[in-house]
Amino acid sequence: MVAVSIDSVIDISAADQSTAASGVAIKDELPNGDYILVAVDIDTTGRRLIDEIVQLAAYTPTDHFEQYIMPYMNLNPAARQRHQVRVISIGFFRMLKSMQTYKIIKSKSEVAALKDFLDWLDQLKSKNPNTDGIVLLYHEERKFIPYMILQSLVKYGMLDRFTKTVKSFVNSFNLAKSSIGDTKHYSLRNLSKILSKAKEDNARVDNDNEADSNSSSADKHVKNGLQKERDEFDGSASVRAKLTFNVALQLSNLDSTEPESSEALSNLFNALKPFTEAISGDVKELDTQNVHLERQNSFRPVFLNYFKTTLYHRVRAVKFRIVLAENGFDLTTLNDIWTEKRIEGLDAALQGIASLKAEDKNELVELLDSFFDPAKVTIKPIIKPSTIRRRNKRNTPAHKPGVGSGSRSASDEFGAGGDKSQSVSSVPDSTTKTPSPIKNGGRPQRKRNSRPSLHTKEVKSAESALNNTAPASISLPNYVPIAATN
């Protein structure tokens, strides 16, 4: 970690080219000078350029900034799950609510939050008047944070003021890729675990010769630190911004014995400098991304059936649209190719896309051919049926030998749905005979009023007494009618 007293302004010298990994695109470097490194991250309503910022956060060893923003649109389900924030409406008012604490979050409008962010950056730069500007550090596999920030600034006419202070964006993902090559995922959480484990191993080796009391106190301190890190929720932009700075600092000082020295920040800047670029390059890329967005939207009718099925096929549709747009294709261009050369032309056009596998290319060719050909029906994605339904699993008795069913709790019997699940599961199947509860091992239910009550006995005895004391029946004689005579 970095001590608060360390000044984050370091003179950038010539970059060490040995830290750049082979195969990583190295852009035009930032001119040499004194720069302030600030880690930045955002929470958004989604992962599209048309989405909005929900939280804007920045971190330095000496200061930090965080502000929630009230968006016009709601967060999509994935964003709500990741950030644990949702939009609620009370009357005519909309507000943000935390799904962890169930409390209302104080938020501002986007223009007010951006103004506060620019004021904070200007104040940070004014504390170091000899600096040449600020470099914003972020960490993500696919570049998205700079585009969202720049687009919001362009929307409110604040880009000129922003470029006077901020000189570059730099992605620490490239640094992680060049520093740690034996891992599959380069997420902040995974990198933090790897670096923490390496730090613990080094500390354990150094403390082998210490006393038992000292080692026990050190282990307790490490456990408390790990528990604190587990409690931090990385779905928040403020937590990720701090984690981005600390992870990048440790990656650039893997061989350093004093990671909290002023030399550590110098190593961090020198390691990141090959991946920096002037802010004007990001603005141009934003314009290109807007063109790509229009191309992606043109493919919406093609992948309409994909978006109506499972999440897996929706993700594949998004991937296909992005790849086609980045390679300069839109629906009109591919339609012209199919009109001229049919399916063979589509196959030849997609062969140049190196980021797609052979089976993905074949799937795209068949899908586009079925869409353009009026004699064919647009292909629908194949959905694999589930093996066993959940209802069948619930109805199937699975008793272990020697274990009675009476020991099972109500939650095991009816699931987490409570009374609702119990009422649903108690409905018998009309196609089968309802099993007896005794045969299934359940406790037999006691019938109501199974014991004759005293009141019932008295009523029955009174009825029998009345029947016995009744007088005998009287037999009436049979009268014979007599006919009258003259």
From Swiss-Prot:
UniProt xrefs under Pfam families: Exu_RNase_H_like, SAM_Exu
GO biological process, one term: bicoid mRNA localization
InterPro entries reported for this sequence: Exu (IPR037998), Exu_RNase_H-like (IPR054362), RNaseH-like_sf (IPR012337), SAM_Exu (IPR040941)
Basic and acidic residues composition-biased segments: 218-233
Gene Ontology MF: a single term: RNA binding
Record region (Disordered): 202-233, 386-477
Composition skew (Basic residues), residue ranges: 387-397
Keyword field contains RNA-binding: yes
Domain of life: Eukaryota
Keywords recorded for this protein, A-Z: Developmental protein, RNA-binding
Disulfide bonding pattern of the chain: none
Job of this protein: Ensures the proper localization of the mRNA of the bicoid gene to the anterior regions of the oocyte thus playing a fundamental role in the establishment of the polarity of the oocyte. May bind the bcd mRNA.
Name of the protein in its database record: Maternal protein exuperantia
Organism, as annotated: Drosophila virilis
